[in-house]
Amino acid sequence: DDLMGYLRQTMEIRALENNISTLLGRAVLKGASHLYAGEEAVAVGAIGALQSDDLITSTHRGHGHAHAHGDQAAKTDEEKQIHFNKMMAEVLGKSGGYCKGKGGSMHIADVAHGNLGATGIVGGNIPVAVGAALAQKLMKTDKVVLCFFGDGASNTGNFHEALNMASLWKLPVIFVVENNMYAMSVPWAKSSALPNVADRACAYGMPGEVVDGM
């Protein structure tokens, strides 16, 4: 059942992104919207490994994270539909959205269920995740924070500072780098001396693994 559910979520994210792309082409959506097509399995698999009360932070390319997290938090088909409607309403800037339409495509959040939100600032969510993990440690919960970001964000100061603090303070945070091999138009090989982002983990005394996200 879990595997079928993950497949369904993956297909729903792709369908969602295809529809958003169509709406963008028709100028129905206002402002920028960064699609997650091709990376669906990362969000579904990573979030599927969480407990129901764990937390996530997302990126400007966050539709997939929002759907996977909200769908897995929903217990019934009716709740799943309500989640989908609220997420789509948010993308469209409608008052029925998770953030009453004020967040839009790049700032979807559902704090009540553990989605601490997306951000339009590349790498801006990484220190937020570390702060949330510090809060969990201080409150002595058993919650984990899952932090998504791209390869471009791993070249920002936020990344290095946040990883150093997370390791130093032994915080319950998992960093998931969704490396699509390009930051804007710059290929990874021309922006990093190391072949894999995960190779940087050892500098902060933490494990780093490369996982096939396809």
Where are these regions (language model features)?
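Short, ordered loop/turn segments at secondary-structure junctions
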Residues: 61, 178-181, 213-214
